[in-house]
């Protein structure tokens, strides 16, 4: 739409009896009857190519640092910039003249930071009878220069550059087959990897009230997660939180390379002060970028924060279209839309045999921490793991504040799941005894029950809680988790010859401290094994054979 000489981007969201309803991705002040409208005939799309990593985009894929240079502090409407940096790349061809190609096939590669960036045939190319007519030799070329020409049996020719365009609401399906997500995505957070695992190519959601630690948890997953690329979609979060992400991510050190985490990260931010429709687009933009890097054989982790704001954007658009409202005025198709977004996650086998994945983790911000509201319920039906943060645990400073009893996961973890279930049953029984003790007090509780309660508290404090600001305890490798859980499991399963409550409390307090000291030792160092031996000797001194 042309308004005051500026072209505002919009998307047609409904056509009814010759009347098109348009959603504008900018502030729509000043639009009047008679303003000219241009139809491009294209779907809402993003540009994909080398140079996307390290960038910060808005929901429409405008690079925000470049926009800031051009517009100053406040973004002007109608300003759109190229998302792909204007530069040359060192291209190496991987096909030759006469080779058959189809959608999603690689025609060459360029080095991008830590990765080899595959240059691919557009995913939207139709037909399988295309052949390479000409391809450039190895050398340095501009990102938008033609590097390959392909033609089909009808004589149609298509010029290809390093940049391809992909509609954001169409999933990329250029792969051999989808696989079952069975390999754990290691986050090095004990409570997630052992008790509530996430799989590569799986989905998980993190609902929780404000201030429960969702953002720090996301930082830890981004920093220590076993993913090649991390994409953060901050859609509709408060501007303050987005600023925090933008400030902290470049400072976070990537433990794998020792360089900045930003080198393998893309951030897409649409704060709650930006227009509503662009907020809806930002989730789809993020997942399209994730699928693009998946096609190169990489494992991608997409963190969407927060899907509640995205659903609220849908609610506003649905209201303007005068559609029949569902529960809490959300549209009736809320569930299917959320499901279609999470279904774009997955582990796939590509045509060249590589296994790659997109893992989607969405945070949900239910009003007042009420998990019964429609967005949380619709999300729970489609995700494979639920990490519910609780206000009660964050107030008690038990971090990460994932509630071990309310949360669940359908995936397999890094520790033997049968043992984890036994440990979880101790946690449940300990919690029941704790509830009973609040009524009858310690005096009315038997020594046996009191020991079970203390075992539950021990498991919670030494294994489920983790200090993300401690250089050693912040990241706990799978081997270390198995080792520590093995010792803790034996201590939990042992029977203790203790009758006096004060003696029981003193014993478990000391055992807890020994475990916490163990967390501070370097894995497989002499101190690590010495502390392990000390713990075993200490609990066996009171255990009954």
Question: Can you say where each PLM-predicted feature lies in the sequence?
Answer:
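C-terminal amphipathic alpha-helical interaction region
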Residues: 499-545
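Metallocofactor- and cofactor-centric catalytic cores in central/energy metabolism, strongly enriched
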Residues: 8, 18-20, 42, 125, ...
């Amino acid at each position: 739409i042309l308004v005051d000489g500026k072209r505002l981007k919009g998307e047609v969201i409904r056509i009814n009896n010759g009347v098109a309803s348009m959603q504008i991705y900018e502030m729509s002040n000043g639009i009047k009857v008679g303003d000219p409208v241009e139809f491009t005939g294209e779907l809402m799309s993003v540009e994909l190519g080398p140079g996307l990593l390290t960038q910060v985009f808005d929901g429409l894929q405008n690079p925000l640092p470049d926009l800031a240079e051009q517009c100053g502090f406040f973004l002007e409407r109608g300003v759109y910039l190229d998302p792909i940096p204007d530069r040359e790349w060192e291209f190496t061809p991987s096909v030759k003249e006469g080779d058959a190609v189809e959608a999603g096939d690689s025609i060459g590669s360029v080095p991008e930071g830590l990765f080899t960036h595959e240059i691919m045939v557009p995913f939207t190319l139709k037909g399988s009878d295309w052949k390479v007519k000409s391809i450039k030799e190895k050398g340095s070329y501009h990102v938008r220069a033609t590097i390959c020409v392909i033609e089909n049996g009808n004589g149609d020719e298509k010029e290809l550059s390093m940049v391809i365009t992909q509609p954001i609401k169409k999933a990329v399906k250029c792969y051999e087959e989808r696989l079952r997500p069975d390999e754990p995505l290691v986050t090095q957070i004990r409570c997630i990897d052992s008790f509530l695992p996430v799989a590569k190519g799986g989905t998980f959601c993190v609902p929780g009230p404000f201030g429960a630690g969702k953002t720090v948890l996301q930082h830890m997953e981004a920093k220590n997660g076993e993913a090649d690329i991390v994409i953060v979609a901050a859609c509709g979060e408060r501007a303050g939180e987005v600023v925090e992400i933008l400030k902290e991510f470049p400072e976070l050190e990537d433990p794998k390379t020792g360089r900045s985490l930003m080198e393998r990260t893309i951030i897409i931010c649409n704060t709650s002060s930006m227009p509503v429709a662009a907020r809806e687009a930002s989730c789809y933009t993020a997942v399209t970028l994730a699928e693009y890097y998946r096609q190169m054989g990489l494992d991608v982790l997409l963190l969407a924060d927060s899907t509640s704001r995205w659903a609220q954007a849908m609610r506003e658009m649905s209201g303007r279209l005068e559609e029949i409202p569902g529960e809490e005025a959300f549209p009736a198709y809320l569930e299917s839309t959320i499901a279609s977004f999470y279904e774009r996650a997955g582990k796939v086998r590509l045509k060249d045999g590589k296994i790659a994945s997109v893992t989607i983790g969405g945070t949900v911000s239910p009003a007042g921490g009420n998990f019964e509201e429609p967005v949380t319920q619709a999300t729970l039906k489609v995700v494979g793991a639920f990490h519910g943060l609780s206000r009660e645990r964050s107030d008690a400073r038990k971090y990460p504040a994932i509630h071990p009893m309310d949360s669940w996961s359908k995936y397999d973890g890094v520790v033997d799941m049968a043992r984890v279930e036994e440990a979880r049953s101790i946690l449940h029984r300990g919690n029941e005894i704790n509830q009973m003790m609040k009524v009858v007090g310690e005096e009315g509780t038997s020594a046996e029950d009191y020991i079970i309660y203390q075992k539950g508290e021990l498991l919670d404090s030494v294994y489920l809680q983790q200090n993300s600001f401690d250089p050693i305890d912040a990241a706990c490798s799978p081997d270390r988790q198995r080792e520590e859980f093995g010792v803790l499991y034996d201590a939990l399963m042992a029977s203790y010859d203790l009758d006096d409550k004060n003696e029981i409390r003193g014993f478990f307090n000391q055992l807890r401290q020994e475990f916490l000291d163990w967390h501070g030792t370097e894995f497989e160092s002499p101190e690590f094994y010495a502390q392990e031996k000390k713990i075993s000797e200490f609990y066996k001194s009171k255990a009954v054979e």
